[in-house]
């Protein structure tokens, strides 16, 4: 039995009706304390429980070494509060953000909901973050970097769409020396008009501005929505080639509701008592988790085939099991990210997936990892 999945999760979210965002922030505060105090005993215990290292899992991409292909997706640790802890939880890389040039509070609460019938979540966070300068300072203080760190960039809510390039550029200028790769997020459904920036004529000036500034040739990717039509994806792939992008992150959350079992969004209320509900069709926000799995894999496969496998893909969306992970890798993903599945399954999900992937992987002759007993803090990406 999975104690977290089968006991703790139902108690928190179904029984006590805890606010998912409050639970997440409580966990982040705890991880931040571990990070800030360098609680070596706790970090060592986490490593023993959740780290699984095997040379067959290593991935070499963009001049970086990923100890394994499983990363934490953007949105969980937006401000890099626990950068020193994620390696001890087994992740092969972490993506922070979405970051905007200035701090912003995001959308009104409540803005994060669990949909257990669908093993999904609905969020309308709205890029709440402490701003690029705060993240830059945190990254400068980071003493060790055992796994690559990606930075997800976004537009502020108050910035007009026609000035979006300036926002992405401002954050990139502050952070370009501190991130290992960068992701242009133009696909969140929770910032008004943002998805329109996926159109070629709107995306082109953003990519042009960033690549002109990108003198150190940091890997630059675009994160796309699962709801795009194939011709729209083709246009983005043409831009990716024209602007020498390093890859695509596929995909963000979906606006579709037609395949959900959940009909009403759970309301807040007294624990273990009936609560008010609201029709989910009337609720704004993007859906992540299991309902996204099939479509995100379709998009990965389409990109892989359209580019003859020449454009690396970070696959994200609906990964809960080894079969889910293998499906995306076989579709053409080079790396994987998890978020909602990790929230549902718990921290034991990472080593479980990695063990399965190692059994399914051929040897990786071009990458050598440190011995299995090397402390994670001594591994340099």
From Swiss-Prot:
It catalyses: (S)-dihydroorotate + a quinone = orotate + a quinol. Gene3D superfamilies: Aldolase class I. Keywords: Cell membrane, Flavoprotein, FMN, Membrane, Oxidoreductase, Pyrimidine biosynthesis. Its cofactor is FMN. Catalyzes the conversion of dihydroorotate to orotate with quinone as electron acceptor. Belongs to the dihydroorotate dehydrogenase family. Type 2 subfamily. This is Dihydroorotate dehydrogenase (quinone). It comes from Synechococcus sp. (strain JA-2-3B'a(2-13)) (Cyanobacteria bacterium Yellowstone B-Prime).
